[in-house]
């Protein structure tokens, strides 16, 4: 074993996939501290990958259940933007292929902006179909945010290039004939819903950053329309824009 350099061992560990591989035992018996460090790093990496695979299996349980009932095109649907004082509510519907594996995909609120962007690209690459639904602030004011959220979800489903035969929806029942399941906190329990939430979140964040170029004083690129101190101070100084939800407190007080 000592005939192998540390670099040789590092390169070979890249090819080892099983902790029971005899090479791992050989490395563990190697007296060199640098080799011991490599083994520890490899074992940690394997444990992390195992945990992510187990998470993926758990988060595909609703999809497997639907497929066992004969459904094939299963769309996960979620929306973002219920709480902000400005900007649209955005929904996305995503149909993932049965064989895909996007490890680490989970509730978008638990992911960093960088990670969401990475998963956005992966989902767009892997998905069979992605649909987007957008409902602007003026409509939110007319029909309320709950109804606007449902409308955005329906629009997202209608925007899909393939027609789903089953829907997994985050905490909502939609006025559609399509078979569906409403799942509380679905973006943490279903990969399809998590994918929809990620696409919706990144899409909306990009929209708000673009709006910031037209309305730089409100800090939309940072607050995404939420009622931060900076945003409220801008509302007090400049009043609401066409992007603001006039029926939302405290926007009403600045009209």
Curated annotation (Swiss-Prot):
CC cofactor: Mn(2+); Mg(2+)
RNase H type-2 domain location: 72-255
Record keyword rRNA processing present: no
EC code: 3.1.26.4
Domain of life: Bacteria
Cofactor note as given: Manganese or magnesium. Binds 1 divalent metal ion per monomer in the absence of substrate. May bind a second metal ion after substrate binding.
Pfam families given in the database record: RNase_HII
GO biological process: DNA replication, removal of RNA primer; mismatch repair
GO MF terms held by the record: manganese ion binding; RNA binding; RNA-DNA hybrid ribonuclease activity
Compartments (UniProt record): Cytoplasm
Entry GO CC: cytoplasm; ribonuclease H2 complex
EC top class, as a word: hydrolase
Keyword set, alphabetical order: Cytoplasm, Endonuclease, Hydrolase, Manganese, Metal-binding, Nuclease
Amino acids binding a divalent metal cation: 78-79, 170
PANTHER family: RIBONUCLEASE H2 SUBUNIT A, RIBONUCLEASE HII
Function: Endonuclease that specifically degrades the RNA of RNA-DNA hybrids.
Family: Belongs to the RNase HII family.
NCBIfam families referenced in this protein's UniProt entry, alphabetically: PRK00015.1-1, PRK00015.1-3
Designated name of the protein: Ribonuclease HII
Record organism: Bacillus subtilis (strain 168)
């Amino acid at each position: 074993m000592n005939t192998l350099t540390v670099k040789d061992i590092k390169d070979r560990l890249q090819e080892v996939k099983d902790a029971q591989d005899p090479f791992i035992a050989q490395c563990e018996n190697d007296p060199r501290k640098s080799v011991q460090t490599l083994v520890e790093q490899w074992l940690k990496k394997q444990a992390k990958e195992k945990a992510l695979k187990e998470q993926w299996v758990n988060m595909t349980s609703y999809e497997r259940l639907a497929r066992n009932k004969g459904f094939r095109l299963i769309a996960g649907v979620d929306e973002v933007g219920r709480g902000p004082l400005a900007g649209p509510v955005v929904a996305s519907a995503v149909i993932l292929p049965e064989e895909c594996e996007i490890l680490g995909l989970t509730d978008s609120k638990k992911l960093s902006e960088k990670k969401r962007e990475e998963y956005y690209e992966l989902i767009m690459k892997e998905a069979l179909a992605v649909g987007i639904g957008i409902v602007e602030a003026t409509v939110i004011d007319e029909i309320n945010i709950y109804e606007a959220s449902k409308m955005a979800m329906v629009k997202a489903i209608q925007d899909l290039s393939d027609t789903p035969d089953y829907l997994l929806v985050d905490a909502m029942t939609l006025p559609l004939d399509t078979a569906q399941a409403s799942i509380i906190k679905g973006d943490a329990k279903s990969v399809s819903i998590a994918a929809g939430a990620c696409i919706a979140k990144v899409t909306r964040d990009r929209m708000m950053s673009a709006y910031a170029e037209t309305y730089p004083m409100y800090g939309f690129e940072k607050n995404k329309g939420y009622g931060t101190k900076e945003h409220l101070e801008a509302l007090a100084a400049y009043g609401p824009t066409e992007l603001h939800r006039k029926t939302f407190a405290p926007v009403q007080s600045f009209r």
